[in-house]
Every structure is written in structure tokens, then in C-alpha cells.
Amino acid sequence: MRLKIITLLICILALSACGSKPEITIDSDVNSVSSSHPDLNQDKRFNDGFVGFVVKKENNQVLVTNPNVQDFSANGGEKYYYSAEWYTNVPSNIEIGQKVEVWGADGAKTTQYPGRDTAVDVEVLQTPQPDGANLIEEDAIRKALASKEVAAANYSWPVIKEVKYDISKSRWTIFVTQMSEEKVLEIIVDDK
């Protein structure tokens, strides 16, 4: 009987040693606390951010729209739905036309369209400049969004569907649409 109790105590002791608690360290040099278990809601290594193009910038916030269309018409929703988010707390160097990935604050997102969130981190996704091009992609997008065609379309939330550069004609073609629109504007931007 004594052997069974000792064996049971050893098993309990071994099992309790297997449990782990987060290891917390305090760095006295910078007064910060870190944990061996990252915050999966805030750590961008564990969460994809919202990827899209910056299409508007006003009042210290930017509107980012995603070019991938979703069809929710089978459930009574939009046939041409494009995700869009207004972000506050964005660095001042973020400009219209840039392709970005934005990580939002946990729980700050709203359900309205476009959504609203506070940016925790923003990364500009660099696109290579095509051989022979004078402009970079973000400059061509900025010119397209400022064009009279886009102004005439009166898009509240423009979406950059696609960007192409034609080296033989030395021009960019920017395809622009918006939520609920099947129609896509084809904006030509001279490479100057």
C-alpha cells in the first residue's frame, strides 16, 4: 500500500512539473515587461494585417481599400463587396497611393462600412519600379485618383483593382472601382 501511495505522489509531482506558467522578465534598463507567451492579438507575426491601397487621407486618418472582390449576393448582400477601413493613429509619412498592411487595435474595429480602427502598426509594401518607368506605382495611383474621370464618378470609397505599366507606350493603366460597382474605370496615366 505504501508503494502505491509513493508511486502516486511521484506521478502527481511529475505531472505538476509539466505545467508551464508564462515566464515574465523585467528589463530594468527600459522599464518594460515581456512575456514568453506573446499577445496573439497584437503581435503581427501571428496575425495578418489588412492589406490594401491608401485611397484617401483626411483629418489624421487614412482610408485603405482591398482590391479583392467578394460576392455576398447569395445571402442577400452585395455582389461586389470590397473591404475598406478608415485607420487613425497612422504615421504622417503614409501617403495616398501606397500599398500598405495595417494591424489594427484589438477590439477597436466597428461594424459600419467602411470600418474604423486604430492602427497599431503600418507597413508600406514596396512594389518594384518597372524597367523603363519614370514613375513608381504609388505616384501613378495618386495621379489616377486625382483624375477628372475618378472625380466625375464621385466615388466615396475608391478601390484600386489593378495597376499595369506598358513599357512600349510609356504609360500606366490604373483600374478603379468602388463598393457595389460592376463598372471599372480604366485610367491612363502618362509616365511623366
Language model: regions and residue ranges:
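Positively charged n-region of N-terminal signal peptides that target proteins for export
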Residues: M1-T7
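Flexible glycine-rich surface loops and low-complexity tracts that mediate binding to linear polymers
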Residues: S92-Y113
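Bacterial signal peptide processing site
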Residues: G19-K21
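Beta-strand/loop nucleic-acid-binding surfaces
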Residues: S73-N93
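A short, surface-exposed beta-strand/turn
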Residues: M179-K192
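C-terminal motif of bacterial Sec signal peptides marking the signal peptidase cleavage site
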Residues: L13-A17
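Short aromatic-glycine-enriched beta-strand elements
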Residues: N59-P67
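Short, non-transmembrane alpha-helical segments in secretory-pathway proteins
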Residues: S36-Q42, F50, T127-I160
